[in-house]
From Swiss-Prot:
Protein name, entry field: Sialic acid transporter NanT
Swiss-Prot/TrEMBL keywords: Cell inner membrane, Cell membrane, Membrane, Sugar transport, Transmembrane, Transmembrane helix, Transport
Transmembrane segments: 22-42, 58-78, 86-106, 116-136, 148-168, 170-190, 224-244, 247-267, 278-298, 313-333, 353-373, 374-394, 406-426, 431-451
Protein's UniProt keywords contain Cell inner membrane: yes
Annotated membrane topology: Multi-pass membrane protein
HAMAP family: MFS_NanT (MF_01238)
Family listed: Belongs to the major facilitator superfamily. Sialate:H(+) symporter (SHS) (TC 2.A.1.12) family.
Catalytic activity: N-acetylneuraminate(in) + H(+)(in) = N-acetylneuraminate(out) + H(+)(out)
Gene symbol of the encoding locus: nanT
Role noted for this protein: Catalyzes the proton-dependent transport of sialic acid.
Classification via SUPFAM superfamilies: MFS general substrate transporter
Amino acid sequence: MSTSTQNIPWYRHLNRAQWRAFSAAWLGYLLDGFDFVLIALVLTEVQSEFGLTTVQAASLISAAFISRWFGGLLLGAMGDRYGRRLAMVSSIILFSVGTLACGFAPGYTTMFIARLVIGMGMAGEYGSSATYVIESWPKHLRNKASGFLISGFSVGAVVAAQVYSLVVPVWGWRALFFIGILPIIFALWLRKNIPEAEDWKEKHEGKAPVRTMVDILYRGEHRIINILMTFAAAAALWFCFAGNLQNAAIVAALGLLCAVIFISFMVQSSGKRWPTGVMLMLVVLFAFLYSWPIQALLPTYLKTELAYDPHTVANVLFFSGFGAAVGCCVGGFLGDWLGTRKAYVCSLLASQILIIPVFAIGGTNVWVLGLLLFFQQMLGQGIAGILPKLIGGYFDTDQRAAGLGFTYNVGALGGALAPILGALIAQRLDLGTALASLSFSLTFVVILLIGLDMPSRVQRWLRPEALRTHDAIDDKPFSGAVPFGSSKDAFVKTKS
């Protein structure tokens, strides 16, 4: 940028079409967050009406995680082939239909299937909306695009909690799911009123359709084996998260089977760049492992160990959720100022200062606890708002939506595993200590993975001939692409 351009406020670099594109995607992401958390809000009512066991009730939450990886792959491939806009609209319709079906569900099986549909739609929305907005905004503002967008999910969760308190006491739990019809109307408006992402349009206009991840896996030479592995992964995940298995060895074996299948898919679809894809899955996995114990078990901690009443719990959770939403936006500014990886590391290091006080302060002063949680979540959870920008930079435009959708949603299985780890540690320690120790230790793993740019570093170690030296989204160099101590002159821009 020229000096004169740098003096212009950042928001004036965006035209009306770019703001409209962002607003549409942000509302879609808000609706995604709204729909996803509804089941957690009404789980006790659903369990009571259907006569479910605790395991069956919990499986309705896990169901969305079981299908997410496939939704990210399928709808991401749609975005790579037919455009980000169509994939985003299709994702919104998919999770809206699933939510509406939950409202009509006559029993457990129907609701479980509906939750699978919601998981697929949510995964597709993440990949398609993120790539749509990032590719629509100028390169120097793409961390802001990512962070601002992801804040919509946290806002949607807060809105869902408020709507729950107004709707369910009067009309019952099913009425909450009937609101799921509204995003479909919104999706139809989107289809006619938003432009296609600029990067995708420039890459594909007038050219033959690209070969997507779906083409490679399910229409290629190994399609039969890959279809069988897809069913095997789905069955293994179901038994792990919804099958009430008591044998830890069997669960570990099924988890290992899923890991082998997902790595196999990444190797087939990414070719020589598979080390980058596998490391990105690990980054996301540990990002969920450090953050989701608090996300999932904080309400339990507040109710059981601090003995807070429901109203106080709601107030504290508001601080937490609002902090995460603000943090996504702050992370966007930090990312464009410091660079994506440096901003991520600095924010996580700052959050580490707060994690111990959050669980050491006790429950005597609710406002102090709320403020500590606000800032801890702002720095620790909110910075994940620029994770789509970080992941997307490792993929070329042709494979970005499916690459982002698949790697993120495979790693997101850590979100299903994290509460279990927290609960297991809490059997030996109190819950607050368990959550603090788990989050504190695993955050350092993410700091190392991102700070050392391990995706590029492992790529350089294993398959250097396919190494990408610069971010595909903003053209900034990858620090892990050259050995320690090498001059910056060693960076030579390459295409993968």
